[in-house]
Regions:
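Catalytic cores of glycan-processing enzymes that make or break glycosidic bonds
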Residues: 1-124
């Protein structure tokens, strides 16, 4: 840990790590030590025992987002896997019946609003 602390201390900006997928065991410790924010995606939970992350369970020091630079947009994700979308619609959005396709604007707005208003999440 020679260069990273200097980079983090060189700015007043909040630093966020893309700690998704397979990350080395030392990463959480380093992030905690340097107060680096974690990146949280509801559709890609870090807990392998769940299909979707619960926004209310995101760490205090985190940024939650709908997707990242190498993932599909919300509308693309919605139509990618109808069965997964249906499960999200029922279990995460608590809605009954078939999930609408394509994703209507009112529902996209609801999903984004849930991310923006979730605590302690800071959505960007």
């Amino acid at each position: 840990m020679k260069k990273l602390p200097k980079l983090v201390q060189a700015t007043r900006m909040l630093v966020c790590a893309e700690d998704l997928g397979m990350v080395p065991d030392c990463v959480p410790w380093v992030m905690d030590e340097l107060k680096i924010l974690s990146l949280e995606l509801q559709s890609m939970p870090k807990d392998p025992s769940v299909k979707f992350g619960h926004l209310s369970r995101n760490p205090y020091r985190s940024v939650c987002t709908i997707s990242s630079h190498d993932m599909p947009t919300l509308r693309m994700w919605w139509d990618e896997n109808i069965q997964r979308t249906q499960e999200y619609y029922n279990t995460m959005l608590y809605r009954q019946g078939p999930a609408p396709h394509p994703l209507p604007g009112w529902l996209a707005s609801d999903i984004i609003s849930r991310h923006l208003t979730s605590h302690p999440c800071s959505a960007y």
